[in-house]
Amino acid sequence: QVLLLVKKQQPWFTRVTNNYLLGYYVFRHDAEKILAVADELLSVMPGQINYLKAKADALLLLGNDTAAVEVQKTILDIDSLNFDANLFLGCYYAIKGQEKLKSIDQQYLEDSNGLSISASVYKEEKRQVIDDDIACAKKYFTIAARVRSNKYLSEQLSMLSGLSDELPQSSGVIRPFLKRLKQE
């Protein structure tokens, strides 16, 4: 309350007050207020990475992943070796790609006889995800690892490199079970 009062009555002190408010709102995880203060600070200092990071975190807290990704990419436009932005984008694309691959595998397994869509179409879909999202994740993780290598990044890069377009094999139990469920 005191900071808001000072900000209102002493306009020349706004930037300093906003810095303190931003820190407070980040600590409280108050995404809407973080976003408001960060935008106000960015209007004066658009290239400030700390403000952009706070804005990206707030957007993520609000569930706006796409906008958070764009802000993180803006950070990389300013500093292409920013560890946090590269790590965030690597994680984002890795998760997005793995979710798509899992969805394709599930769809393939649910296709009772493999007749609705041929296996080659599923493989092509998986190849596309690996070439797009997974390759993007590997690129960002590789840059982050060059800046500050750690075990997590090495494991993620290894795991992502091991992904393939191979289709899952269903056991003899799953297909009959799925058929029975569909009939009931």
Per-segment meaning from a language model:
Residues 1, 95-140:
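Short coil/linker segments at helix-helix boundaries
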Residues 9-10, 44, 78, 147:
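Structural marker of alpha-solenoid helical repeat scaffolds
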